[in-house]
Amino acid sequence: MFMVVVLGYSMNPAVFRYLPFAGFFFVCTTSRAVLLSILPLKALLLVGNAQMVSVLFFMVSVCGIGVSLSVPFMLRKTDLQNGFLISVFSMAVSVAFLWTGTLWSFAVGMVLHVFSVTSMEVMLSLYVMQRIPRRQLPEFEPLRMVSAIVALSIGPWLGVYLQLRVADWLPFAIAIAGTVATLIYFRWLGLHRMSMPTRDFGAGNPLRHIGRFFRQPRLRLAWSLILTRSSWWMMFIIYTPIYASQSGLGELTGAAIVSIGSAWTLTLPYWGWFARRYSLRRLMYMGFTVATVMSLMVFVFSGTPRVAIVLLVFAALGATMLDGSGHVLFLRAVHPLERSEMTGVFQTYRDVANLAVPGFFAILLKFFALPVIFIGAAGWMMVGTLFSRYIPRRM
Protein backbone atom coordinates (compact mmCIF):
# COMPACT_ATOMS: atom_id res chain seq x y z
CA MET A 1 0.00 0.00 0.00
CA PHE A 2 2.81 2.42 0.89
CA MET A 3 4.43 1.97 -2.52
CA VAL A 4 1.09 2.56 -4.22
CA VAL A 5 0.68 5.84 -2.38
CA VAL A 6 4.22 6.99 -3.18
CA LEU A 7 3.72 6.01 -6.82
CA GLY A 8 0.52 8.02 -6.80
CA TYR A 9 2.48 11.07 -5.73
CA SER A 10 5.06 10.63 -8.47
CA MET A 11 2.32 10.33 -11.10
CA ASN A 12 0.54 13.51 -10.01
CA PRO A 13 1.94 16.29 -12.24
CA ALA A 14 0.67 19.04 -9.96
CA VAL A 15 2.62 17.64 -7.01
CA PHE A 16 5.67 16.63 -9.06
CA ARG A 17 6.09 20.25 -10.11
CA TYR A 18 6.71 21.22 -6.49
CA LEU A 19 9.20 18.46 -5.63
CA PRO A 20 12.24 20.77 -6.00
CA PHE A 21 10.63 23.16 -3.54
CA ALA A 22 9.91 20.28 -1.14
CA GLY A 23 13.58 19.27 -1.45
CA PHE A 24 14.55 22.72 -0.22
CA PHE A 25 13.31 21.72 3.22
CA PHE A 26 15.87 18.89 3.31
CA VAL A 27 18.71 21.33 2.66
CA CYS A 28 17.39 23.87 5.18
CA THR A 29 17.15 21.21 7.88
CA THR A 30 20.65 19.77 7.43
CA SER A 31 22.42 22.36 9.58
CA ARG A 32 20.38 21.64 12.69
CA ALA A 33 19.88 17.92 12.00
CA VAL A 34 23.56 17.06 12.21
CA LEU A 35 23.75 18.74 15.64
CA LEU A 36 20.46 17.40 16.96
CA SER A 37 21.87 14.74 19.30
CA ILE A 38 25.18 16.50 19.84
CA LEU A 39 23.62 19.49 21.60
CA PRO A 40 21.91 17.68 24.55
CA LEU A 41 24.98 15.48 25.01
CA LYS A 42 27.27 18.51 25.04
CA ALA A 43 24.93 20.25 27.47
CA LEU A 44 25.08 17.15 29.70
CA LEU A 45 28.88 17.29 29.58
CA LEU A 46 28.91 20.98 30.51
CA VAL A 47 26.37 20.96 33.37
CA GLY A 48 26.62 17.41 34.69
CA ASN A 49 23.09 15.96 34.94
CA ALA A 50 19.73 15.78 33.17
CA GLN A 51 18.01 18.12 35.63
CA MET A 52 20.53 20.90 34.95
CA VAL A 53 20.28 20.24 31.22
CA SER A 54 16.56 20.92 31.58
CA VAL A 55 17.27 24.16 33.42
CA LEU A 56 19.73 25.26 30.73
CA PHE A 57 17.33 24.54 27.89
CA PHE A 58 14.55 26.30 29.80
CA MET A 59 16.64 29.46 30.23
CA VAL A 60 17.62 29.42 26.58
CA SER A 61 13.97 29.11 25.59
CA VAL A 62 13.02 32.05 27.81
CA CYS A 63 15.46 34.19 25.84
CA GLY A 64 13.96 33.03 22.53
CA ILE A 65 10.25 32.99 23.34
CA GLY A 66 9.48 36.32 21.64
CA VAL A 67 11.21 35.53 18.38
CA SER A 68 8.20 34.32 16.40
CA LEU A 69 6.10 37.28 17.47
CA SER A 70 8.81 39.71 16.35
CA VAL A 71 9.15 38.29 12.84
CA PRO A 72 6.36 40.38 11.24
CA PHE A 73 8.05 43.50 12.68
CA MET A 74 11.40 42.35 11.27
CA LEU A 75 9.82 41.73 7.87
CA ARG A 76 8.36 45.23 7.82
CA LYS A 77 11.81 46.66 8.41
CA THR A 78 13.41 44.47 5.73
CA ASP A 79 11.54 42.09 3.41
CA LEU A 80 10.92 38.37 3.00
CA GLN A 81 14.27 37.65 1.30
CA ASN A 82 16.38 39.59 3.81
CA GLY A 83 14.46 38.07 6.69
CA PHE A 84 15.37 34.61 5.41
CA LEU A 85 19.02 35.64 4.94
CA ILE A 86 19.13 36.91 8.52
CA SER A 87 17.84 33.53 9.70
CA VAL A 88 20.49 31.62 7.75
CA PHE A 89 23.28 33.92 8.92
CA SER A 90 22.13 33.51 12.53
CA MET A 91 22.31 29.73 12.12
CA ALA A 92 25.93 29.94 10.90
CA VAL A 93 26.94 32.20 13.79
CA SER A 94 25.17 29.95 16.31
CA VAL A 95 27.15 26.94 15.09
CA ALA A 96 30.41 28.81 15.70
CA PHE A 97 29.38 29.53 19.30
CA LEU A 98 28.12 25.99 19.89
CA TRP A 99 31.46 24.56 18.79
CA THR A 100 33.31 26.24 21.66
CA GLY A 101 33.79 24.47 24.97
CA THR A 102 32.51 27.00 27.50
CA LEU A 103 29.07 27.15 29.06
CA TRP A 104 28.45 30.84 28.33
CA SER A 105 29.31 30.52 24.63
CA PHE A 106 27.20 27.36 24.36
CA ALA A 107 24.26 29.22 25.92
CA VAL A 108 24.69 32.15 23.49
CA GLY A 109 24.88 29.70 20.61
CA MET A 110 21.68 27.98 21.75
CA VAL A 111 19.80 31.30 21.89
CA LEU A 112 20.94 32.15 18.35
CA HIS A 113 20.05 28.61 17.31
CA VAL A 114 16.50 29.02 18.64
CA PHE A 115 16.19 32.37 16.84
CA SER A 116 17.39 31.00 13.52
CA VAL A 117 15.23 27.87 13.59
CA THR A 118 12.08 29.70 14.65
CA SER A 119 12.41 32.63 12.27
CA MET A 120 13.28 30.33 9.38
CA GLU A 121 10.14 28.29 10.06
CA VAL A 122 8.07 31.47 9.77
CA MET A 123 9.78 32.50 6.52
CA LEU A 124 9.36 29.05 4.99
CA SER A 125 5.68 28.95 5.94
CA LEU A 126 5.19 32.27 4.18
CA TYR A 127 6.98 30.97 1.09
CA VAL A 128 4.75 27.88 1.12
CA MET A 129 1.62 30.01 1.26
CA GLN A 130 2.97 32.15 -1.58
CA ARG A 131 4.01 29.28 -3.82
CA ILE A 132 1.56 26.41 -3.19
CA PRO A 133 -2.17 26.73 -4.03
CA ARG A 134 -4.40 26.12 -1.02
CA ARG A 135 -6.11 23.12 -2.62
CA GLN A 136 -2.76 21.37 -3.11
CA LEU A 137 -1.52 21.95 0.44
CA PRO A 138 -2.79 18.55 1.74
CA GLU A 139 -0.68 16.81 -0.92
CA PHE A 140 2.36 19.07 -0.58
CA GLU A 141 2.59 18.99 3.22
CA PRO A 142 3.56 15.29 3.57
CA LEU A 143 6.26 15.80 0.92
CA ARG A 144 7.56 18.82 2.80
CA MET A 145 7.60 16.89 6.04
CA VAL A 146 9.38 13.92 4.45
CA SER A 147 12.05 16.17 2.95
CA ALA A 148 12.73 17.90 6.26
CA ILE A 149 12.75 14.85 8.47
CA VAL A 150 14.80 12.66 6.13
CA ALA A 151 17.58 15.05 7.15
CA LEU A 152 16.53 14.61 10.76
CA SER A 153 16.69 10.82 10.29
CA ILE A 154 20.27 10.88 9.03
CA GLY A 155 21.71 13.82 10.93
CA PRO A 156 21.56 12.80 14.63
CA TRP A 157 23.43 9.51 14.26
CA LEU A 158 25.83 10.88 11.64
CA GLY A 159 26.71 13.90 13.77
CA VAL A 160 27.55 11.87 16.88
CA TYR A 161 29.37 9.21 14.84
CA LEU A 162 31.59 11.79 13.13
CA GLN A 163 32.28 13.54 16.41
CA LEU A 164 33.24 10.32 18.24
CA ARG A 165 35.00 8.43 15.45
CA VAL A 166 36.45 11.08 13.11
CA ALA A 167 36.86 14.61 14.49
CA ASP A 168 35.09 16.71 17.09
CA TRP A 169 34.85 19.72 14.77
CA LEU A 170 33.50 17.89 11.70
CA PRO A 171 29.73 17.97 12.50
CA PHE A 172 29.96 21.71 13.10
CA ALA A 173 31.75 22.21 9.79
CA ILE A 174 29.00 20.23 8.05
CA ALA A 175 26.38 22.42 9.75
CA ILE A 176 28.03 25.58 8.42
CA ALA A 177 28.32 24.00 4.97
CA GLY A 178 24.59 23.32 5.19
CA THR A 179 23.88 27.04 5.58
CA VAL A 180 25.92 27.75 2.44
CA ALA A 181 24.02 25.05 0.53
CA THR A 182 20.75 26.59 1.75
CA LEU A 183 21.67 29.96 0.24
CA ILE A 184 22.66 28.37 -3.08
CA TYR A 185 19.43 26.35 -3.30
CA PHE A 186 17.43 29.43 -2.27
CA ARG A 187 18.69 31.38 -5.27
CA TRP A 188 18.38 28.39 -7.62
CA LEU A 189 14.67 28.13 -6.78
CA GLY A 190 14.27 31.83 -7.46
CA LEU A 191 12.82 32.48 -4.02
CA HIS A 192 14.86 35.68 -3.78
CA ARG A 193 12.60 37.13 -6.48
CA MET A 194 9.42 36.46 -4.49
CA SER A 195 8.02 39.22 -2.32
CA MET A 196 5.00 40.05 -0.22
CA PRO A 197 3.33 43.45 -0.01
CA THR A 198 4.37 45.35 3.10
CA ARG A 199 0.76 45.43 4.29
CA ASP A 200 0.82 41.61 4.48
CA PHE A 201 3.43 41.76 7.23
CA GLY A 202 1.12 43.42 9.70
CA ALA A 203 1.75 46.48 11.80
CA GLY A 204 2.10 47.56 15.39
CA ASN A 205 2.91 45.43 18.40
CA PRO A 206 2.81 41.76 17.34
CA LEU A 207 1.59 40.80 20.81
CA ARG A 208 -1.81 42.19 19.93
CA HIS A 209 -2.24 39.42 17.34
CA ILE A 210 -2.33 36.78 20.09
CA GLY A 211 -5.85 37.71 21.11
CA ARG A 212 -7.08 37.69 17.52
CA PHE A 213 -5.44 34.28 16.96
CA PHE A 214 -6.88 32.56 20.02
CA ARG A 215 -10.35 33.98 19.48
CA GLN A 216 -10.57 31.77 16.38
CA PRO A 217 -11.45 28.22 17.48
CA ARG A 218 -9.89 26.46 14.48
CA LEU A 219 -6.59 28.32 14.88
CA ARG A 220 -6.64 27.62 18.60
CA LEU A 221 -7.21 23.92 17.96
CA ALA A 222 -4.45 23.75 15.34
CA TRP A 223 -2.00 25.41 17.72
CA SER A 224 -2.90 23.18 20.67
CA LEU A 225 -2.54 19.94 18.72
CA ILE A 226 0.76 20.85 17.11
CA LEU A 227 2.05 21.97 20.51
CA THR A 228 1.43 18.53 22.01
CA ARG A 229 3.05 16.86 19.01
CA SER A 230 6.06 19.18 19.09
CA SER A 231 6.45 18.71 22.84
CA TRP A 232 6.70 14.94 22.43
CA TRP A 233 9.39 15.31 19.78
CA MET A 234 11.22 17.79 22.02
CA MET A 235 11.27 15.18 24.78
CA PHE A 236 12.43 12.53 22.32
CA ILE A 237 15.23 14.65 20.86
CA ILE A 238 16.66 16.02 24.11
CA TYR A 239 16.26 13.13 26.53
CA THR A 240 16.70 10.01 24.38
CA PRO A 241 20.48 10.54 23.99
CA ILE A 242 20.73 11.35 27.70
CA TYR A 243 18.72 8.26 28.70
CA ALA A 244 20.84 6.04 26.46
CA SER A 245 24.06 7.52 27.82
CA GLN A 246 23.08 7.19 31.48
CA SER A 247 21.55 3.71 31.11
CA GLY A 248 24.77 2.32 29.68
CA LEU A 249 23.69 1.97 26.06
CA GLY A 250 26.10 4.68 24.95
CA GLU A 251 25.91 8.02 23.16
CA LEU A 252 26.04 6.53 19.67
CA THR A 253 23.13 4.21 20.45
CA GLY A 254 21.08 7.14 21.73
CA ALA A 255 21.76 9.10 18.55
CA ALA A 256 20.87 6.03 16.49
CA ILE A 257 17.50 5.75 18.27
CA VAL A 258 16.77 9.40 17.47
CA SER A 259 17.61 8.73 13.82
CA ILE A 260 15.55 5.52 13.67
CA GLY A 261 12.58 7.15 15.38
CA SER A 262 12.76 10.06 12.95
CA ALA A 263 13.05 7.65 10.01
CA TRP A 264 9.40 6.69 10.50
CA THR A 265 8.69 9.89 8.59
CA LEU A 266 9.47 8.03 5.39
CA THR A 267 5.92 6.74 5.84
CA LEU A 268 4.46 10.26 5.79
CA PRO A 269 3.08 9.99 2.24
CA TYR A 270 1.04 7.03 3.45
CA TRP A 271 -0.29 8.91 6.47
CA GLY A 272 -1.12 11.87 4.23
CA TRP A 273 -3.10 9.50 2.02
CA PHE A 274 -4.74 7.96 5.09
CA ALA A 275 -5.89 11.42 6.25
CA ARG A 276 -7.43 12.18 2.87
CA ARG A 277 -9.02 8.73 2.58
CA TYR A 278 -10.34 8.26 6.11
CA SER A 279 -10.14 11.81 7.59
CA LEU A 280 -7.51 13.85 9.36
CA ARG A 281 -9.46 13.51 12.58
CA ARG A 282 -9.16 9.72 12.62
CA LEU A 283 -5.45 9.84 11.79
CA MET A 284 -4.63 12.23 14.62
CA TYR A 285 -6.73 10.34 17.15
CA MET A 286 -4.90 7.14 16.24
CA GLY A 287 -1.47 8.80 16.36
CA PHE A 288 -2.02 10.35 19.77
CA THR A 289 -3.30 7.04 21.14
CA VAL A 290 -0.28 5.06 19.91
CA ALA A 291 2.18 7.64 21.25
CA THR A 292 0.41 7.72 24.63
CA VAL A 293 0.36 3.95 25.15
CA MET A 294 3.92 3.37 23.95
CA SER A 295 5.32 6.22 26.07
CA LEU A 296 3.72 4.67 29.16
CA MET A 297 5.24 1.31 28.25
CA VAL A 298 8.68 2.91 27.93
CA PHE A 299 8.40 4.05 31.54
CA VAL A 300 7.30 0.58 32.67
CA PHE A 301 10.33 -1.05 31.00
CA SER A 302 12.80 1.80 31.63
CA GLY A 303 14.82 -0.50 33.90
CA THR A 304 15.44 -2.73 30.88
CA PRO A 305 16.96 -0.22 28.43
CA ARG A 306 17.11 -2.52 25.41
CA VAL A 307 13.36 -3.12 25.63
CA ALA A 308 12.59 0.51 26.46
CA ILE A 309 14.34 1.92 23.40
CA VAL A 310 12.41 -0.43 21.10
CA LEU A 311 9.15 0.76 22.64
CA LEU A 312 10.37 4.34 22.28
CA VAL A 313 10.87 3.80 18.56
CA PHE A 314 7.25 2.64 18.26
CA ALA A 315 6.10 5.64 20.28
CA ALA A 316 7.83 7.72 17.62
CA LEU A 317 5.66 5.97 15.05
CA GLY A 318 2.59 7.40 16.78
CA ALA A 319 4.11 10.88 16.71
CA THR A 320 4.93 10.39 13.03
CA MET A 321 1.28 9.68 12.27
CA LEU A 322 0.60 13.15 13.65
CA ASP A 323 3.29 14.61 11.41
CA GLY A 324 1.27 13.31 8.47
CA SER A 325 -1.09 16.23 9.02
CA GLY A 326 1.72 18.74 8.63
CA HIS A 327 0.38 22.27 9.14
CA VAL A 328 -2.81 21.57 7.21
CA LEU A 329 -5.12 22.43 10.11
CA PHE A 330 -3.54 25.87 10.38
CA LEU A 331 -3.07 26.53 6.67
CA ARG A 332 -6.71 25.76 5.92
CA ALA A 333 -7.97 27.87 8.82
CA VAL A 334 -5.90 31.04 8.47
CA HIS A 335 -7.33 34.02 6.58
CA PRO A 336 -5.12 35.01 3.58
CA LEU A 337 -4.96 38.66 4.69
CA GLU A 338 -3.72 37.63 8.15
CA ARG A 339 -1.23 34.95 7.16
CA SER A 340 1.92 36.78 8.26
CA GLU A 341 0.61 37.85 11.68
CA MET A 342 -1.14 34.54 12.35
CA THR A 343 1.90 32.54 11.17
CA GLY A 344 4.05 34.42 13.68
CA VAL A 345 1.66 33.50 16.48
CA PHE A 346 1.19 29.92 15.25
CA GLN A 347 4.94 29.30 15.16
CA THR A 348 5.14 30.07 18.87
CA TYR A 349 4.16 26.43 19.41
CA ARG A 350 7.84 25.66 18.90
CA ASP A 351 8.93 28.26 21.45
CA VAL A 352 6.30 27.16 23.96
CA ALA A 353 7.40 23.52 23.53
CA ASN A 354 11.03 24.56 23.91
CA LEU A 355 10.08 26.39 27.09
CA ALA A 356 7.48 24.10 28.65
CA VAL A 357 9.16 20.72 28.13
CA PRO A 358 12.53 21.43 29.80
CA GLY A 359 10.83 23.64 32.40
CA PHE A 360 8.37 20.89 33.32
CA PHE A 361 11.06 18.23 33.40
CA ALA A 362 13.45 20.45 35.37
CA ILE A 363 10.87 20.34 38.17
CA LEU A 364 10.11 16.61 37.85
CA LEU A 365 13.79 15.63 37.70
CA LYS A 366 14.42 17.56 40.90
CA PHE A 367 12.41 14.89 42.73
CA PHE A 368 12.30 11.82 40.45
CA ALA A 369 14.66 9.74 38.33
CA LEU A 370 15.06 10.30 34.58
CA PRO A 371 12.37 7.79 33.40
CA VAL A 372 9.66 10.07 34.82
CA ILE A 373 9.91 12.07 31.58
CA PHE A 374 8.11 9.27 29.75
CA ILE A 375 5.09 9.53 32.06
CA GLY A 376 5.02 13.28 31.48
CA ALA A 377 5.12 12.83 27.71
CA ALA A 378 2.34 10.23 27.84
CA GLY A 379 0.23 12.64 29.88
CA TRP A 380 0.21 15.48 27.39
CA MET A 381 -0.25 13.11 24.46
CA MET A 382 -3.36 11.80 26.21
CA VAL A 383 -4.63 15.38 26.32
CA GLY A 384 -3.95 15.59 22.58
CA THR A 385 -6.06 12.47 22.10
CA LEU A 386 -9.00 14.22 23.73
CA PHE A 387 -8.51 17.46 21.80
CA SER A 388 -8.29 15.66 18.44
CA ARG A 389 -11.98 14.81 18.76
CA TYR A 390 -12.75 18.49 18.10
CA ILE A 391 -11.30 18.38 14.58
CA PRO A 392 -14.18 18.93 12.12
CA ARG A 393 -15.46 15.60 10.81
CA ARG A 394 -15.26 16.78 7.21
CA MET A 395 -11.47 17.05 7.58
Regions found by a protein language model. Name each.
Residues G8-S61, R218-I257:
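Helix-loop boundary and gating motifs at the non-cytosolic
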Residues F2-V15, L191-S224:
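Juxtamembrane intracellular "pre-TM" segments in multi-pass secondary transporters
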Residues A50-Q51, R134-R144, E251, V334-F346:
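Loop-to-transmembrane helix entry/capping segments in MFS-fold secondary transporters
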Residues H113-A148:
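Cytoplasmic helix-loop-helix junction between adjacent transmembrane helices
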Residues V67-D79, Q163, T267-L280, L365:
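Helix-to-loop junctions at the C-terminal end of transmembrane segments
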Residues N82-A96, I176, R282-L296:
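Structural signature of the two symmetry-related core transmembrane helices
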Residues L337-K366:
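A late C-terminal transmembrane helix in Major Facilitator Superfamily
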Residues L170-R187, F374-R389:
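Symmetry-related core transmembrane helices of the 12-TM Major Facilitator Superfamily/SLC fold
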